[in-house]
Amino acid sequence: MPTRLPTLTDFPTSLHLTITPPPPSSPQLTNILILLHGLGDTSASFTNLGKQLSLPETTCISMQAPTPLPFELGGFHWGDDIQFDQATGNMDFDTGFSKAIKILKQEVIEDCLVGKCGYKHREIMFFGFGQGAMAAIAAAASMNEELGGIISIGGLLPASDTSAKAAKTPLLVLGGSSNTLITKTAITNLEASFQNVEYHRWSKAGDGMPQNREEMLPIMRFFARRLKSRKGVPGGSVEIG
């Protein structure tokens, strides 16, 4: 069992993050959910998400990507570099994740959550959107330990991933029915790097965040399976059908 909740002073001062403790009705310290925003966003939106989820026995940590976007574009990014697609003019999601891996794997998980607070790897989960999901996938793929899981909305396996063996961490991937990055090739690549990949295809177009109960249902089912509980899930806290 973890010895205590993490505090802001446990983390390097270079990291910008917020910590949302478990609901008062669930005082046990059991799980950590690390929330990673998408390209060009900040941690604020996922801080609100953590509060809205209100998962029992779960502390939510919303992290801000380490590097601001250039040219007064606003927001932050998880990549090692900034590149633009010459055909579309859009920013490339996949520009290397060595910096993000170091932050997530070493500074956050190993040094703070495991080393200082006594959490087990199995008690730590990721929820990532877009480029944030790719950062989570890259970090988990580089680890020998099994984490609680990754929920990836529109996140791919980074091209830079060179893992020699499939990671143990279970992965839930969600994407739209059209205009999506989650193609058959993307799933095949993920299945080559992770032992357990579950794919849910939404009926809507695009890889946006879930907007209703139907779109949230596979996520809540994944939480129900993978979040640890020392006294059971309180009625109504996690809707599974």
Model-derived regions, located:
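Short beta-to-alpha linker loops that shape the active-site pocket of alpha/beta-hydrolase fold enzymes
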Residues: 64-68, 156, 205
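Primarily recognizes the serine-hydrolase "nucleophile elbow" in alpha/beta-hydrolase
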Residues: 122-167
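Short beta-strand/loop motif that positions the catalytic acidic residue
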Residues: 167, 171-175, 179
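C-terminal catalytic histidine-bearing segment of alpha/beta-hydrolase fold enzymes
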Residues: 184-241
